Regions:
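Short hydrophobic beta-strand element within catalytic cores of glycosyltransferases
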Residues: 321-324, 334, 342
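Short His-centered aromatic/hydrophobic patch
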Residues: 89-95
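Aromatic "clamp/platform" in nucleotide-sugar-dependent glycosyltransferases that forms part
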Residues: 285, 304
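Donor nucleotide-sugar binding/catalytic pocket of nucleotide-sugar-dependent glycosyltransferases
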Residues: 55-56, 135, 139-207
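N-terminal strand-loop element at the rim of the active site
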Residues: 8-67, 154-158, 165-167
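A short, well-ordered alpha-helix in the C-terminal region of glycosyltransferases
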Residues: 209-212, 367, 374-389, 395-400
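Short, structured helix-loop element that forms part of the nucleotide-activated donor/catalytic region
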Residues: 43-48, 253-279, 283, 374
Length: 407
């Protein structure tokens, strides 16, 4: 029996490559999967790793009427040619264009997976435009999937769509491979030995080695942040908290993993502090964050807004408790007092900055320093809570069951 054709769309190939790793190969067992995105150099990686056909479509993330109309026409022609049973999209611009084009091409099933809602951090006219884009995308979709319960509630509260909404499994776009995201596997991969032979002593020695290479001592309490080093990830508040804590606790350290971007760039004084403070170690972007998570004692993730963030899940799978803000996704992954701590969110429902979270962040980070037994208890809970809810295979099977319900 011929397999139904399924087209998965993201705006750029970096999302197709990073967000959907392994999932497309899994789905290709049951459907004829095509990946569609703008090729910025990673589309061939997707093609080879996932074993699927990929098509380059010149879509841009930012609003550009001429380029958007051109991309819309290309998508329409592609869908008319390929005649897919379903077009399933995520990322804002790719979703907007592909849902309209799929509707015009009479694709039977048009699925929009809503991850982050960009308008939540915007104001004025831009906020209105971004909300309108979400409404249009949802209106042209036959099915809308919120990535988590927080996104679901926001879509309803902001009257983005009246369509029925249901989160797949416990949420998240791709789940986590907890076999790969484990201390034992990390040591095995880096020492080139079988994970079955890795002992607790091997893991302790490896952690100590990585800490030493990063300039940390056994007495240091190391917080780690992973992500874009930008304002809406809470970098201003995190730098202020670290300044205060460094005066009180000379052995507190911050390990920063990620890129410093020009868009939403941090202020000069924050930039200088994060690069020059002896209490901060900046290592830039890393292809494998597992050794850095092993070197840390806790994740700090004071983001302003998310859809369903991957970093707290990765940290949890690596046995780290987390400090997060009370925002979509983060407050689903973390259960306050069980596998981390939740502090107030800086933005209200209209994207206005209503709370300076610096005092709460400082207080909570200091609580971690003062309560090693509680931190250890939350650490023991962390991995189990990720495995129970976000194991990758469970997320994939949940998505497959959703697809089959539409056949």
């Amino acid at each position: 029996m011929e397999k139904k054709k399924l087209i998965r769309v993201t705006t750029h190939d970096i999302s197709l490559n990073g967000l959907l790793e392994g999932q497309l190969k899994f789905l290709n067992q049951y459907y004829d999967v095509i990946g569609l995105a703008k090729d910025t150099g990673e589309l061939d990686t997707v093609r080879q790793r996932e074993g699927i056909h990929c098509i380059d479509v010149p879509m841009e993330r930012e609003i550009s009427l001429r380029k958007d109309v051109k991309a819309l026409y290309i998508l329409y022609k592609l869908f008319r040619k390929e005649k897919p049973w379903m077009v399933h999209s995520n990322t804002p611009k790719g979703s907007l264009l592909s849902m309209i084009a799929a509707w015009a091409a009479r694709v039977p099933r048009r699925v929009y997976l809503v991850t982050g809602l960009r308008y939540q951090g915007a104001h004025g006219l831009l906020r209105t435009i971004l909300k309108t884009m979400e409404r249009i995308t949802c209106s042209f979709a036959t099915n809308v999937i919120p990535e988590g319960q927080g996104v679901l509630h926001t879509l309803q509260a902001d009257h983005i769509t009246a369509k029925p909404l249901k989160v797949i499994h416990y949420g998240n776009i791709n789940g986590k491979d907890t076999k790969h995201l484990s201390r034992r596997q990390t040591v095995a991969d880096n020492l080139h030995i079988s994970p079955d032979t890795v002992t607790d002593n091997d893991m302790a020695e490896y952690r100590q080695t990585v800490r030493r290479q990063l300039g940390f001592t056994d007495d240091d309490f190391v917080f780690i942040f992973i992500g874009r080093i930008v304002t809406d990830k809470g970098m201003t508040e995190l730098s202020r908290a670290m300044k205060t804590l460094s005066d009180r606790h000379p052995n507190v350290r911050l390990l920063l993993v990620g890129t410093m971007e020009k868009g939403d760039a941090i202020a000069d004084d924050v930039h200088d502090y994060l690069l020059n403070s002896k209490n901060v170690k900046y290592v830039g972007s890393q292809t494998d964050v597992r050794p850095f998570l092993m070197a840390a004692d806790a994740l700090v993730f004071p983001s302003y807004r998310e859809g369903f963030p991957n970093v707290p899940m990765e940290a949890g799978a690596m046995d780290l408790p987390c400090i997060v803000t009370d925002i979509n996704g983060s407050n689903e992954i973390i259960r306050d007092g069980l596998n981390g701590k939740i502090i107030e969110a800086p933005l209200d429902g209209h994207g206005r900055h209503v709370h300076d979270i610096t005092p709460a962040l400082t207080k909570t980070m200091e609580w971690f320093i003062f309560h090693p037994a509680e931190v250890s208890r939350m650490s023991r809970n962390a991995r189990r809570m990720i495995k129970e809810r976000y194991e990758q295979r469970d997320v994939w099977n949940g998505l497959l069951a959703f697809y089959r319900s539409l056949e």
